[in-house]
Amino acid sequence: MSKKSEKRATAVAAVVVCLVVLLTAVGPAMVTARPANEIPVESVLAEDQPQQPTSEAWNSVPAVEVPMASAPSGLPNASDTSIETLRVQSARTEERLYVRLSWADGTADRNISGPQQFVDAAAVQVPVNTTARPPISMGSTRNPVNVWYWRADGETEELLAGGPGTTTKFEQSAVETKTAYDDGRWTIVMSRELNSDAENRTSFAANDDVDVAFAVWNGSQMERSGRKSVSEWYHFPFGPGPQGPPYESILWTVAGLAIVGVALVTIQAVQKNGGD
């Protein structure tokens, strides 16, 4: 074999190696990729007690790290909030939806014993009409939202809102909350029946993706009312198929194309040198 042929054979072998590495890396990513801003809903068994924050049922449920930012507000120091990331998991049985929230908080603020003291709190927001996305700041009169609002003093409220300052409490909350605080971290599970025929109460039984947003208050940092950490819209994939771009696949595809591009440039350089 000539020296020129040896160089070409080496270049081809390099490309083959690159493609094998690419397929090994991209294959699993393409299989596990999910649409952007999706909170996967995993099926679990009711007997595994998913309502408990420390249940082993949650070990097999994918978690999403949701970035949090200060909510726009005219309150003093409204931009000075402390919760930057919320870990979210979601599961369902045949009858109920479970949403598990977990975040770092150095103090468990459960009681108010004096002025200027506030309890920790968290909220889950979903639209009443699951086919249309409402304004993220508490919905609107035409497209209201349900808010599941938990306070560390033990209270869970189910609210209806049609815009900022319009919240009204359901006469009886259908939302149940279980909580755990350990090693500087809150973990709570909020759950509700999937189906609901009640007026102005979200039903998860339809074949529609359901938008969802989150909020967290750190009581020891004077966070209350509009001073809170909030997310952008995410969604539960209850619909018939993927919605939105599979961002993980896109990232891996870009990386793969870059590898192939480098390999092609290498081949051209080898061929050029071989012809000199």
Swiss-Prot record:
Q: Which GO terms describe its cellular component?
A: periplasmic space; plasma membrane
Q: How does it sit in the membrane?
A: Peripheral membrane protein
> Which Pfam families does this one have?
EB_dh (PF09459)
What cofactor does this one take? heme b
GO MF annotation terms = heme binding; metal ion binding
Subcellular location, in the record's words? Cell membrane
| Superkingdom, natural source | Archaea
Q: What is its main location?
A: membrane
| Keyword field | Cell membrane, Electron transport, Heme, Iron, Membrane, Metal-binding, Nitrate assimilation, Plasmid, Transport
Quaternary organization: Probable multiprotein complex; a catalytic heterodimer of an alpha and beta chain is proposed to associate with additional subunits involved in membrane attachment and electron transfer.
Per the entry, what this protein does is: The respiratory membrane-bound nitrate reductase enzyme complex plays a role in generation of metabolic energy by using nitrate as a terminal electron acceptor during anaerobic conditions. May transfer electrons to the iron-sulfur centers of the catalytic beta subunit.
Under the heading NCBIfam families, the entry gives:
DMSO_red_II_gam
Q: What is this protein called?
A: Putative respiratory nitrate reductase heme subunit ORF7
